[in-house]
């Protein structure tokens, strides 16, 4: 249940980091690497949504998808923080939301790892 909440918060943050939310930089200022980041973000978003859907029926698979999706999202966040995606500076609200998302991603990774370990215990 905690993993589902963390993933839902992450999905909400991803949406807030888009032009549907608080992103104000125009797409015309996006660099080539930024287009790759958009693909990575959508792939991670799809993995998070699939993980939420599968969490209560196939916990092991859901936790693997959550781990992969969370790891994928670190690349666009760090790339944006370094200025690799846009020729304009990061708006303050995006900057703050990305830091919050890093914390949520770390929590998601921890919870997904915990679900994975509990769904497939190692022999003792």
Task: Set out the residue ranges of the language-model regions.
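Juxtamembrane helix-break-helix junctions at the cytosolic face
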Residues: 48-64
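Hydrophobic residues within alpha-helical transmembrane segments
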Residues: 8, 68-71, 96-99
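A cytosolic-side transmembrane-helix exit/cap motif
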Residues: 29-30, 82-94
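Hydrophobic core of alpha-helical transmembrane segments in multi-pass integral membrane proteins
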Residues: 11-15, 49-52, 102-113
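Membrane-interfacial loop-to-transmembrane alpha-helix junctions, especially the N-terminal start
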Residues: 1-7, 59-67
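Hydrophobic transmembrane helix segments
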Residues: 1-46, 73-77
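Alpha-helical membrane-associated segments of multi-pass integral membrane proteins
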Residues: 88-120
């Amino acid at each position: 249940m905690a993993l589902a909440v963390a993933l839902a918060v992450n999905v909400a943050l991803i949406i807030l980091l888009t032009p549907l939310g608080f992103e104000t930089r125009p797409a015309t200022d996006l660099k080539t690497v930024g287009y790759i980041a958009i693909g990575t973000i959508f792939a991670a978003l799809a993995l998070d949504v699939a993980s939420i859907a599968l969490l209560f029926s196939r916990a092991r698979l859901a936790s693997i998808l959550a781990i992969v999706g969370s790891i994928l999202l670190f690349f666009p966040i760090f790339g944006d923080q370094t200025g690799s995606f846009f020729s304009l500076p990061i708006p303050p609200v995006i900057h703050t939301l990305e830091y919050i998302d890093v914390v949520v991603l770390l929590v998601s990774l921890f919870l997904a790892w915990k679900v994975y370990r509990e769904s497939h215990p190692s022999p003792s």
